Amino acid sequence: MSPPKNCAVCGDKALGYNFNAVTCESCKAFFRRNALAKKQFTCPFNQNCDITVVTRRFCQKCRLRKCLDIGMKSENIMSEEDKLIKRRKIETNRAKRRLMENGTDACDADGGEERDHKAPADSSSSNLDHYSGSQDSQSCGSADSGANGCSGRQASSPGTQVNPLQMTAEKIVDQIVSDPDRASQAINRLMRTQKEAISVMEKVISSQKDALRLVSHLIDYPGDALKIISKFMNSPFNALTVFTKFMSSPTDGVEIISKIVDSPADVVEFMQNLMHSPEDAIDIMNKFMNTPAEALRILNRILSGGGANAAQQTADRKPLLDKEPAVKPAAPAERADTVIQSMLGNSPPISPHDAAVDLQYHSPGVGEQPSTSSSHPLPYIANSPDFDLKTFMQTNYNDEPSLDSDFSINSIESVLSEVIRIEYQAFNSIQQAASRVKEEMSYGTQSTYGGCNSAANNSQPHLQQPICAPSTQQLDRELNEAEQMKLRELRLASEALYDPVDEDLSALMMGDDRIKPDDTRHNPKLLQLINLTAVAIKRLIKMAKKITAFRDMCQEDQVALLKGGCTEMMIMRSVMIYDDDRAAWKVPHTKENMGNIRTDLLKFAEGNIYEEHQKFITTFDEKWRMDENIILIMCAIVLFTSARSRVIHKDVIRLEQNSYYYLLRRYLESVYSGCEARNAFIKLIQKISDVERLNKFIINVYLNVNPSQVEPLLREIFDLKNH
């Protein structure tokens, strides 16, 4: 066993060579950040500091000089271009290695198959004929052969292995779920064309056990869900639309699973409709969200080839709904997007809670609709075929600021439209069940829903019931275990924010000599405040890295989300540490006189950022900004914003953000009463939009400073170039 190594710079424990010298991880990172920087360090002491584990923070100049003296080479530091080339090379080699492993596995598998009893020449030629006869198969085969130079017999073996026509449902699902890291490649091999995709899904859905195994996998890996949809939609835009359409409703997961179990043939039929007429299929889903009967009419028209006439469309709902098979194709339409529910699967808080609610109320609600539809209209304005979410918001939430048509990804309109739909979906069947119980007990009596009175008149209550949940249903508003785990993860991740900042501030003050007295562009105190934000951002980065969903994303997306969202997270977090009495931010410092940073320092910045910040703080209800759970969830919402520049997997990020929107709503419901919780949710969504607006003012402050006077981390985040 080799003796332990010590860092040649500070004496700390070292693992090996870094940039041509034995150093610890701290000195390696310090050298990588500062060796190529144009920033000029100065020693605050005698120009010959003794660098140890303790003192290495206090003098950057002597530490950097010692790094160079022991032989660390700055030319060994990789540029961004070099890093990108290396990353691509690693991915290429990894892909080649997987192809070779798959080819070897295929050859081994072929030895045990019955078809290997045939003559090898016949088998090889038949497989080659199969590839030459299909354009898609040719493209797939050429890619494999280009990356992995197999012989003719080896090339035919993978083709035989991934031929879905010769595989059982169990083997198909095994290939996808056995190795989640390679599931995407398995889907590409199994579904090379639209027809193959339909054949594979038909075979899987016909086996209930294997279908549920696949559903479970897709809930955990939503990217694979989107890939499968795109295989038979043949259009990335339409596939993404279908993928996201059901994600925001917590009740769809239960419906999808139950319909796969009840009527698998209808699910396959619906997927075929998606393939041939995706526009109509999307229309079906939109209608089915709010009006199952309307969805059935559209579905029947498509299934019959568009032959349904106007009389059939306007006929009484009862004959349609009385047909049990007719009910199932619509819900299987949802069911086909079991993959779609993967968004909620990616959000643990959603499916466990709503499974308990919907299994009890939703299925009977759909099944019993025929008995009430003819004599009692659907008791929700949302169930009207003419229902429009945007119009409903403008009429029922007119106390909110006017909504612009050009709204951002986190705007109140874009989120509220999804939230309101979730509300109707979640309470639709519950309130119908409640109304049926009331009618049986007392006809014509006046009922009260959560404090909102409804008259005996049938039309008037229908306009008011969606506003408040029925008080007759005692819903369990406590967070379930999955939701608590997701919230607990945020709490644990935020522990880094509470570490004392003594050492960070000391190191920061040592570097303040870079602020030139003759530079009158900015006040020195404002520059200190700007550099202090680097300490906060470093801690927010540590927090983000402890969130599982963020950690599982590719490095490109992680960098893009942090560069675009760190200041918004900092703004959101700052409202919690703001002291109204002192008009200052409280920081975790052991010395009380160092633990407060006055907000009036913002007055030295250009523009009216101080006034905007005060407006933001004063309009943020104290009971919300003092609730750490709310602030942490909102930090996660602004972090997972798919509109950031240079983001690659926007759909996955949007999926994760929606899960935190849902967690915020559920948490508010567990703390406040029904109407108060919804009002709080709407107001908090508006605050997220306000954060985006305030962030633009703050970014302008960073862009107007001299890059040589700010921390390297800030230069990297805001792409500041040294003058």
From Swiss-Prot:
GO terms for cellular component: nucleus. The keyword Metal-binding applies. Residues 4-79 bind DNA. Keywords: DNA-binding, Metal-binding, Nucleus, Receptor, Transcription, Transcription regulation, Zinc, Zinc-finger. Induction: By 20-hydroxyecdysone (20HE) 106 hours after egg laying. One of its GO terms (molecular function) is zinc ion binding. Pfam families: Hormone_recep, zf-C4. The keyword DNA-binding applies. Transmembrane segments: none annotated. One of its GO terms (biological process) is cholesterol homeostasis. Gene3D superfamilies: Erythroid Transcription Factor GATA-1, subunit A, Retinoid X Receptor. Residues 122-142, 151-163 have a biased composition (Polar residues). A zinc finger (NR C4-type) spans 7-27, 43-67. It is found in: Nucleus. Residues 483-723 form the NR LBD domain. Residues 95-163 are annotated as: Disordered. Belongs to the nuclear hormone receptor family. NR1 subfamily. Binds selectively to the HSP27 20E response element. This is Nuclear hormone receptor HR96. It comes from Drosophila melanogaster.
